[in-house]
C-alpha cells in the first residue's frame, strides 16, 4: 500500500518552468528556456544549469518574482489528485529544483504536506544572481527521499514519485511506483507508469 507521494513542481504540479517565467520579465526567456531544456534532458549538469540560469536573473526585482510565483498556472488535476492521495492516508510532498517563493505559496493552494526547494538570494529588493538550498544537485531529490523514508518509516515499495526531467532520476531510484509525467525520454525509460496527457488525475487510474 502506498504511503508517500513525492511530486516535482515545475512541469509537473505546475504547467511550465518558474525560472522561465522570471526570465521572460528580463527579455531572456528563450536563452534561459534553452538551458532549462538541456538540463531536464540530461545533457547539462543540473547544478551548473541552475547557477547559470539564476545568474542571468541578477537585478530582477524581488517584487516581480513574488508576483509571478503567486500567479503560476497549476497543472490540470493537481489539487484534486493531491486531495485524493491524502484521503487514502498518504503523505504528499513536493521536491523542486526550483524556488521556495513558488513551492511554499503553492503548498497552501494545492494542499501538499511539505515542500523542499531552493532559495533565491535577495539584496536591496533585487535578485543577486545567487541561489542556495536543498535541491541544487542531480542527486538531491534521491538523497532527500531516502531521508524522508527513514524518518517516516516508509519503504521504497510504499513510495510513489512523479516527475518529468533528468533531475528526478535520483528519486526514481528509491521508489516502487515511478510516474513519468509528460516527461523527457531519459526519465520515461526508468518509469513504470507513463502519463502523456497534461492531467495528473490520470495517475489515480494507474495506482
Where do the PLM segments sit?
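C-terminal cap/substrate-recognition subdomain and adjoining C-terminal extension
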Residues: 69-207
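Alpha-helical substrate-recognition element adjacent to the catalytic core
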Residues: 1-119
Amino acid at each position: 500500500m502506498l504511503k508517500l507521494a513525492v511530486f516535482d513542481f515545475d512541469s509537473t504540479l505546475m504547467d511550465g518552468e518558474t525560472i522561465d517565467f522570471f526570465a521572460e520579465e528580463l527579455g531572456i526567456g528563450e536563452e534561459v528556456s534553452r538551458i532549462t531544456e538541456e538540463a531536464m534532458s540530461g545533457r547539462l549538469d543540473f547544478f551548473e544549469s541552475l547557477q547559470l540560469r539564476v545568474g542571468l536573473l541578477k537585478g530582477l526585482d524581488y517584487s516581480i518574482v513574488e508576483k509571478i510565483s503567486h500567479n503560476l498556472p497549476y497543472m490540470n488535476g493537481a489539487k484534486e489528485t493531491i486531495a485524493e492521495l491524502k484521503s487514502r492516508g498518504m503523505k504528499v510532498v513536493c521536491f523542486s529544483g526550483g524556488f521556495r517563493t513558488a513551492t511554499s505559496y503553492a503548498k497552501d493552494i494545492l494542499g501538499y504536506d511539505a515542500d523542499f526547494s531552493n532559495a533565491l538570494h535577495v539584496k536591496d529588493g533585487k535578485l543577486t544572481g545567487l541561489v542556495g538550498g536543498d535541491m541544487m544537485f542531480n542527486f538531491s531529490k534521491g538523497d532527500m527521499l531516502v531521508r524522508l523514508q527513514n524518518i517516516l518509516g516508509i519503504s521504497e515499495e510504499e513510495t510513489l514519485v512523479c516527475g518529468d526531467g533528468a533531475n528526478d532520476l535520483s528519486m526514481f531510484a528509491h521508489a516502487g511506483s515511478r510516474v513519468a509525467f509528460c516527461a523527457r525520454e531519459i526519465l520515461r525509460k526508468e518509469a513504470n507508469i507513463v502519463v502523456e496527457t497534461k492531467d495528473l488525475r490520470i495517475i489515480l487510474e494507474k495506482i
